[in-house]
Amino acid sequence: MSKSDYYELLGVSKNATSEEIKKAYRKMALKYHPDTNPGNKEAEEKFKELSEAYDVLIDQDKRAAYDKYGHNAFDGAAGRGGFDFNSGFSGDFSDIFNDLFGGGFGSRGGRGSSRRSEGAAGSDLRFDVEITLEDSFNGKKVPISYVTYVKCSSCSGSGSEGSAKSVQCNTCHGAGSVRTQQGFFTIERTCHVCNGEGEIIQNKCKKCSGSGRVRDEVNLLVTIPKGIESGNKIRLNGKGEAGYRGARSGDLYVYSNIQKHKFFTRSGPDLYCTVPIKMTLAALGGHIEMPSIDGTWTKVKVPEGSQSGDKLRLKEKGMPVINSSKRGDMYIQITVETPVKLTKKQKELLQKFDDEPNVDCNPQSTGFFQKVKSFWKDIRSN
């Protein structure tokens, strides 16, 4: 049966760089690897073809020979101008995958036949807590509850009943994995007898069935530090999933989510708010009373002639800087409110005010219309 073109197998052009070939193989190998397709013979054959293609195209000498002679370069026919590479693919899957994936497949993260596999470490866990802005300002202790694997109290995580000892697995001889030869290729898989442990417990703990861990509810009191922001995480070492047979436990990551505040918005340690003021206060100036996140009230001066969009700054009236004694600032943005539903007398007074000749009274609008007049004058002159 004729072989598929190596370039077509990997989905790359004949001018592909080594990086492009490596990237293409990585993508295809993840899809067809036997560990991700258990019992799928078609996927296994596809994976063999991909690995053979990669082994040839990633090597400059082999690739040059393949480009010149095609598959004949590897049939041992050197006398006919071929190129003998000991049947083409001479490598080991684990060599390729260690190079590409750092031992993620086959070798079980580097725990191959050189030594017995250790117990699998517990997974890290995530827990989200929702707090108020005031909680972030003051700091808080938050009770949390979650269900996960915890160390078995009966066997203290060993998986053995009483003083029972473990014996070496006769299938993998303590390696934790077994290798099978299929044609040119060597495939390494986790030992199905000992599940990669390399040893078998003679008398398993009845409570945990030899795993050294059981599912249970965990209750903790988490300290939320002052100044924490949404998306910040708190790491609790060893509070994640318990490891298999006494292996290292995972960590717990508590993520904070701060509720939307009815008055303040936040950017880092600084707080922002928008305050509407009367037109007369903006024009004449004065003072307003402003609440702070710490529960106090502050008298704030509004300068004469304030405009919408002007900002007033209150130093160190913002949020605490996390793990520091400093605080951010509070910014008050002014919005000048236009009066509505005026009485007849109020309208007359406003009209009288507007009729008073004072070019400096409304500098923005006066300056704007002067620019408009100048604009039209320039157009007409052209």
Swiss-Prot record:
GO terms for molecular function: ATP binding; heat shock protein binding; unfolded protein binding; zinc ion binding. Its cofactor is Zn(2+). Zn(2+) 2 binds at C169, C172, C191, C194. Zn(2+) 1 binds at C152, C155, C205, C208. The keyword Membrane does not apply. InterPro entries: DnaJ, DnaJ_C, DnaJ_domain, DnaJ_domain_CS, HSP40/DnaJ_pept-bd, HSP_DnaJ_Cys-rich_dom, HSP_DnaJ_Cys-rich_dom_sf, J_dom_sf. GO terms for cellular component: cytoplasm. Transmembrane segments: none annotated. Keywords: Chaperone, Cytoplasm, DNA replication, Metal-binding, Repeat, Stress response, Zinc, Zinc-finger. Binds 2 Zn(2+) ions per monomer. The keyword Amino-acid biosynthesis does not apply. It is found in: Cytoplasm. A zinc finger (CR-type) spans 139-217. The J domain is necessary and sufficient to stimulate DnaK ATPase activity. Zinc center 1 plays an important role in the autonomous, DnaK-independent chaperone activity of DnaJ. Zinc center 2 is essential for interaction with DnaK and for DnaJ activity. Participates actively in the response to hyperosmotic and heat shock by preventing the aggregation of stress-denatured proteins and by disaggregating proteins, also in an autonomous, DnaK-independent fashion. Unfolded proteins bind initially to DnaJ; upon interaction with the DnaJ-bound protein, DnaK hydrolyzes its bound ATP, resulting in the formation of a stable complex. GrpE releases ADP from DnaK; ATP binding to DnaK triggers the release of the substrate protein, thus completing the reaction cycle. HAMAP family: DnaJ. PANTHER family: CHAPERONE PROTEIN DNAJ (PTHR43096:SF48), DNAJ HOMOLOG 1, MITOCHONDRIAL-RELATED (PTHR43096). Belongs to the DnaJ family. This is Chaperone protein DnaJ. It comes from Ehrlichia canis (strain Jake).
